[in-house]
Amino acid sequence: ILPLGFDHILFVLSLFLLSPKLKPVLWQSLAFTIAHSVTLGLAMYHVIKPTQKIVEPVIALSIMYVALENIFSPRLRASRIGVVFCFGLVHGMGFASALSSLGLPSNSYLTSLVMFNVGVELGQLTVILTAWFLLAKWFGNKPYYHKYIVIPLSALIAAIALYWAIQRIF
């Protein structure tokens, strides 16, 4: 997800913050991966033609939404996985732009798609496990976790995402 995946990293961190236990965040990560794989594949095979002028600001707004949900919701809701899946569909369209800019020959789309998704998933798992070890393992069950860790970090992520959204719109 590096060097150009900072928006992706912030999205995954936002998912993690409200889900300091590994199982819920791994399910969200899986839903996100399945969703972005679908739209990435459809875009790579020209079934859909996403407009990056729309997709890129929506990606930034999706990061902001999840970060704000972290701030205003004291706990993970069951609907979160559906929201993450929907946002994954949008992120897949953004990934398609990045992958297609590499100029891949059409006979290697499937292999490239599979390898790209494996790489993205490994990157997501690395971000999740690192965040879990640095934050949740030590502080995730503390009474102050939401107030002093989730809210400030989510506010920072939301502010960055808002900046990106404005930048991508204008």
Question: Where are these predicted regions, by residue range?
Answer:
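Membrane metalloprotein/metal-transporter helix-bundle signature
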Residues: 1-170
